């Protein structure tokens, strides 16, 4: 959170919510926050619907929010560092990339563990996770289109970034 606060401060933004006035950002935010599931530990043990919703939420958030959605932003921020601009941001982004990568990896690992423990989850969640993947790629494409409205950056091309999220 400190890194993102520093980023907002460096960019002259008073708070995170300033970003939500951009439709491409608001759509991503709305989708990702709509995937959360609020169940207790006891619910997971006794309620198959709770397990399915938590597994789905975990997979979507871990793989797509922390594994896809942030990386185009990281790439753009790194492009500034490569041009010796926004110098303090570069190190913050390195730490954030490491942190988000661990979150993504561990969340996906936890999802796989849940599927090992409850094998029916994979089939129950597969379709909704696939649809979520398609949607997040589209939302991220919209976000990249917004970033590059005025053309490619000096050392980062839109098509390269699109290729990154379509892998």
Explain the meaning of each model-derived region.
Residues 1-2, 55-80, 102-106:
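Alpha-helical bundle segments that constitute or directly flank the non-heme di-iron/ferroxidase center
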Residues 1-46:
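Long, hydrophobic, well-ordered secondary-structure blocks that form the structural core
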Residues 6-16, 45-57, 75-95, 109-127, ...:
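Inter-helical turn/loop segments and adjacent helix faces that build the functional surface
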Residues 89, 103-106, 140:
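Alpha-helical interaction elements in eukaryotic regulators
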Residues 95-100, 131-132:
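Transmembrane helix-bundle signature of multi-pass membrane transporters/permeases
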Residues 128-160:
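Primarily interfacial, aromatic-capped hydrophobic alpha-helices that serve as membrane anchors
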Residues 165-167:
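Conserved small/polar residues in nucleotide/adenosyl-binding loops
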């Amino acid at each position: 959170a400190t890194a993102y606060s520093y980023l907002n401060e460096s960019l002259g933004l008073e708070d995170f919510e300033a970003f939500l006035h951009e439709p491409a950002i608001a759509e991503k935010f709305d989708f990702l926050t709509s995937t959360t599931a609020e169940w207790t530990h006891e619910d997971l043990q006794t309620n198959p619907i709770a397990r399915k919703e938590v597994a789905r939420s975990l997979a979507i958030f871990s793989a797509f929010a922390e594994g896809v959605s942030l990386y185009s932003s990281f790439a753009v921020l790194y492009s500034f560092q490569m041009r010796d601009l926004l110098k303090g941001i570069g190190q913050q982004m390195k730490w954030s990339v490491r942190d988000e990568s661990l979150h993504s990896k561990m969340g996906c690992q936890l999802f796989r563990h849940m599927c090992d423990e409850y094998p029916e989850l994979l089939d129950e969640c597969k379709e909704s996770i696939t649809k979520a993947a398609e949607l997040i790629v589209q939302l991220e494409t919209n976000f990249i289109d917004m970033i590059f409205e005025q053309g490619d950056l000096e050392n980062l091309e839109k098509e390269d970034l699109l290729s990154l999220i379509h892998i």
